[in-house]
Amino acid sequence: MIDAFFIAGTDTDVGKTVASKAILQALGAKGLNTIGYKPVAAGSDKTAEGWRNSDALHLQKAATLDIAYDDVNPYALELPTSPHIAAKHEHVEIKYEVLSEKLAHHKEQSDIVLVEGAGGWRVPVSDTDSLSTWVQQEQLPVVLVVGIKLGCLSHALLTAEIIKADGLNLVGWVANRVNPGTEHYAEIIDMLEDRLDAPKLGEIPYIPSAKRKDLGKFINVEPLLNA
């Protein structure tokens, strides 16, 4: 069984956190000790405890192990924009070694760590680096979240292609229905099943306020446990 994996999205706002929560809930139902890890988050609110990102908070709550927020999300950036822009404006340097130290600690504590990305695969974290470079360094297996909408086929196939070109293992994908009005849904799923060289872990239907719901029933985590 893998001890950590990375959640990538075909774009921003495709439901990475929804899928991450669903996977964490499904893993927890198997009796596994889990940690949700959001290394970099852009778009945070000031609280009495410090800056907090809502997606990172959902991961913190969905995991079975209770760890400090700063360990879930070491870089909570205020501005809701590309991480490299937010970091520059906030005079923050995102350091790979910090991300790696946290990940190593999480692996020691848990059975499996879910690492959620930010934006799409090549999202920059500085003027020269992307989060995907760190994922390559860590050699994390990848689960791809596909937001089912017009244009998702090209985005999904291109993202899967570059993940493999980067030398990483695509261990599964999740279909998340972000637009209930998307036509030809079944045909889109059929094409993804045919063209993506990885098992489908599940389909999450369109659900209002999905991040607040029990979603584990939509996910089959056996391919992850056998990877």
UniProtKB/Swiss-Prot annotation:
Binding site for ATP: 13-18, 55, 116-119, 176-177, 205-207
Cofactor(s) it depends on: Mg(2+)
Associated pathway: Cofactor biosynthesis; biotin biosynthesis; biotin from 7,8-diaminononanoate: step 1/2
Keyword Transferase recorded: no
Positions that bind Mg(2+): 17, 55, 116
Gene3D superfamilies attached to this UniProt entry: P-loop containing nucleotide triphosphate hydrolases
Alphabetized InterPro entries for the sequence: DTB_synth_BioD, P-loop_NTPase
EC number(s) stated in the UniProt entry for this protein: 6.3.3.3
Gene Ontology cellular-component terms listed: cytosol
Active-site feature positions: 38
GO molecular function: ATP binding; dethiobiotin synthase activity; magnesium ion binding
Keywords tagged on the record: ATP-binding, Biotin biosynthesis, Cytoplasm, Ligase, Magnesium, Metal-binding, Nucleotide-binding
The reaction(s) this protein catalyses: (7R,8S)-7,8-diammoniononanoate + CO2 + ATP = (4R,5S)-dethiobiotin + ADP + phosphate + 3 H(+)
Compartment(s): Cytoplasm
Any one GO biological process: biotin biosynthetic process
Function per UniProt: Catalyzes a mechanistically unusual reaction, the ATP-dependent insertion of CO2 between the N7 and N8 nitrogen atoms of 7,8-diaminopelargonic acid (DAPA, also called 7,8-diammoniononanoate) to form a ureido ring.
Assembly behavior: Homodimer.
Family: Belongs to the dethiobiotin synthetase family.
Name listed for the protein in its UniProt record: ATP-dependent dethiobiotin synthetase BioD
